Every structure is written in structure tokens, then in C-alpha cells.
Amino acid sequence: MYMPLALVYASFLTLPASTSPATKGNVIQIQVHNIVNLAQTTVAHIRKLRMQLLMAPPIEITTPPIKGLASFSHYLKHLDNELQSPDTDLLSQIQADVSSLDGKVQSLGLMMNCPFQPRPTAEVSRFLFPDIHHYWTIAKVENYLESLHLNRDKLKVC
């Protein structure tokens, strides 16, 4: 009777030694993984929207390079501003994804003490051809987020 009780007691004593709290490095790695997953989900939403609207395949657009968290967040804010369109509600899911992605990037940046630029001012303008503008904006978002997969190591730098 004492032997099983002693084994249970010994297992409780060794439990805290075998499980360690998450380190800052582990938390950063998990956050980067979550950011990349959300970016991939956003790209999937873009492709689904493109199929629903029978849009042409994506065009090649040059987007700024991802240098670190600050530059990534700044361009995400710019894209978020472009996605907030008074003309259509079709982009609301993608806009919500980009906004959420920026929130995750901001959170990671605060953990790493990164300096962030203020949000760029939104340009409120009516486009002569809003559908073309939406197509162009979606292509920019898709291209930028696809480049994140190749540059995920830049998310560990301010």
C-alpha cells in the first residue's frame, strides 16, 4: 500500500522539473507560426473570392520587401486602408484578415520592443473603375502575403 502511494508522490515531485514554462524564444516562434498561418488563410480567402467572382488570374505586382516587423506592419496598414472600400462589401473578409494579421504583428513587435510607424493616412477617393481597383488591391495583398512565407525569418527582426 505504501509503495503505490510513494510512486504517486515521487511522480508529483518530478512533474515540475519535466515541464518548463514557455521561453520568450518559444513564444516568438509560436507567434511567427500563427502569423504565417493567418497569412496563408488570407491567401485562401482571396483565391476563393477570385473563383466566386470569376476574376482573372493574379497579376505580377511589385510590393515592398519585408525587412522586419515594422516594415511588414506598415505595409499591412496601407493595404488595410486600401481594402476599406465604400463601394463594395466583397472585400470585408480579406480586410478583416489583414487587420487581424496586423494586430498579431503589432503584438509580436511589442513583445520584441520594436518601434512602429504610425498608421498611414487613408485616402478616401472614388475610383472611376472600382472593380479594377479591387482586383489590383487583392493582387497586392496576395503577392505580399505569399512573399511572407519565403521571408518568415524576417518576422523575428524589428
From Swiss-Prot:
The protein's location, in the record's own words, is: Secreted
Query: Gene3D superfamilies, per this entry?
Result: 1.20.1250.10
Q: Which residues form a coiled coil?
A: none
Which tissues carry this protein? Highly expressed in the brain and eye. Expressed at low levels in muscle and skin.
Name-wise, this protein is Leptin-B
Q: Residues of the signal sequence?
A: 1-19
Q: Which GO terms describe its cellular component?
A: extracellular region
Q: What does this protein do?
A: May function as part of a signaling pathway that acts to regulate the size of the body fat depot.
Q: Which family does it belong to?
A: Belongs to the leptin family.
Tell me the name of the encoding gene: LEP-B
Give the disulfide map. Answer: 114-158
Q: Which InterPro entries match?
A: 4_helix_cytokine-like_core
Q: Which UniProt keywords apply?
A: Disulfide bond, Secreted, Signal
